[in-house]
Amino acid sequence: EEELDNRDGFRWSPDGKNIAYWQSDTRNVGTFYMINNVDSNYSRPIPLPYPKVGTANSSVKVGVIPAAGGKTKWFNVPGDPRNNYIARMDYIPGSDEVMIQQLNRLQNTNTVWVGNSKTMALKNILTDKDEAFLDIHDNIEWLDHATAFTWTSEKDGWLRLYKVSRDGKTMQLITRGNFDVVN
């Protein structure tokens, strides 16, 4: 999804034995034409599936496949995949767990899931909301041997840094004051 600045579609597990990846189904998504006018004397249209406002989005899901080959197992992330984006996904260091950020189509709710790549069980550990808009969270740093991670949120009007336990049960404010944290 280019609007979410995703430039690749896979993540290696920490032990190198599995690959988690996005699968995007663009059926029913309208065609947008870009013009290629740089590689020859005559321009040509390049068809791309691209949703416009109010039209069908691509349906995206996350799967895990053994690096040696085999059958893909799929996470069953709740919600209509055409009305939610899988905005970010990465393995948690030293584990078989994948952290998935699911952004709703209005882009004002970011639901964070931790999925076990062996059992495919999902657990919601964090939900960040804003009345208007949320930026994608790209600042995750794993702390304390991957028992906690950093999270930024504007939930009180300022962009603040938090330390969140891996299970999402505790969220500790790190930065205080009337200023935004900048990365």
Tell me what each language-model feature is.
Residues 9-11, 20-26, 52-56, 90-93, ...:
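Beta-strand C-termini and the immediately following turn/loop, strongest in propeller blades
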Residues 67, 71-104:
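Long hydrophobic segments that form regular secondary structure
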Residues 73-76, 122-127, 171-176:
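Beta-propeller fold detector
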